[in-house]
């Protein structure tokens, strides 16, 4: 009799434990589902494609630096000894995209090439840190920083959207922040360009990871000049497709490695 009672109690205990384990699995599944739903809801709130109203462009400044950011991307400039982009960050995934400093632009005037801004003497080109930046110098032939202004984006051309084609009434110009850097020719520059002023203009827009850039060249001298060509953007970016995990050729993203040149025969 005692043995039978013991067996019944043991069987009941096993059934209870099995039920508890089964119940625990259900509770775990429910908690996981709630976590996934919460994460999705959180991502939906932060997704700029769905609602980008929280990503407002702004400009922050310190003694020697200026940062243009909207919560999705940021671009940081150093102002002395010359203006140069020292950081270009993807805030959506936390990646730092810049590995080396380049001029802000390059102009070819009367057949001669002149950098605009930028710093030189970076000891290595595959990464960038503050120690490198502190020891870098301005090129003696580069257009040098004079001043900058910060304001709102401006209308580049008149635009009247046809409301019957649009579901949303978006403002024009697209709202955001605008920075204008003004440069003058270096003291050692040739006489023909000493009265040339260059403006490099950046606009970062609200609610989207979009940055526009343009340059303006003004000759205030008496002699005419010829602007043969220009490079408005030169960025030394971190490698996104190293050889250790490359796939087929169409899967490789090709980037400019040096001003004016591109990678070739990448798989070799």
Regions found by a protein language model. Give the residues of each.
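Bacterial Sec-dependent N-terminal signal peptides
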Residues: 1-43
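Polysaccharide-binding surfaces and accessory modules of carbohydrate-active proteins
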Residues: 42-59, 64-68, 73, 87-268
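Short, surface-exposed terminal/edge motifs of secreted or surface/virion proteins that either
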Residues: 75-77
């Amino acid at each position: 009799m005692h043995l039978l009672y013991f067996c019944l109690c043991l069987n009941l205990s096993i059934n209870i434990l099995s039920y508890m384990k089964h119940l625990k699995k259900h509770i775990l599944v429910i908690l996981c589902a709630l976590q996934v739903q919460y994460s999705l809801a959180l991502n939906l709130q932060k997704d700029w494609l769905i609602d980008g109203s929280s990503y407002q462009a702004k400009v922050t400044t310190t003694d020697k630096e200026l940062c243009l950011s909207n919560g999705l991307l940021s671009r940081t400039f150093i102002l002395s000894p010359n203006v140069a982009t020292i950081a270009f960050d993807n805030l959506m995934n936390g990646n730092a995209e810049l590995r080396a400093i380049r001029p802000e632009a390059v102009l070819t005037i009367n057949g001669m090439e002149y950098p605009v801004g930028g710093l030189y003497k970076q000891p290595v080109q595959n990464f960038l840190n503050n120690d490198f930046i502190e020891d870098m110098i301005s090129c003696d032939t580069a257009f040098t920083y004079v001043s900058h202004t910060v304001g709102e984006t401006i209308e580049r051309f008149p635009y009247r959207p046809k409301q019957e084609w649009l579901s949303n009434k978006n403002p024009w110009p697209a709202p955001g922040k605008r920075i204008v850097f003004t440069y003058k020719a270096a003291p050692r520059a040739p006489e023909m360009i000493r009265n040339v002023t260059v403006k490099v203009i950046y606009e970062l827009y609200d609610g989207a990871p979009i940055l526009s850039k343009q340059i303006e060249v003004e000759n205030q001298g008496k002699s005419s000049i010829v602007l043969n060509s220009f490079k408005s953007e030169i960025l030394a970016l971190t490698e996104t497709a190293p050889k250790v995990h490359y796939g087929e050729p169409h899967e490789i993203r090709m980037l400019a490695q040096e001003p004016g040149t591109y990678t070739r025969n990448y798989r070799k």
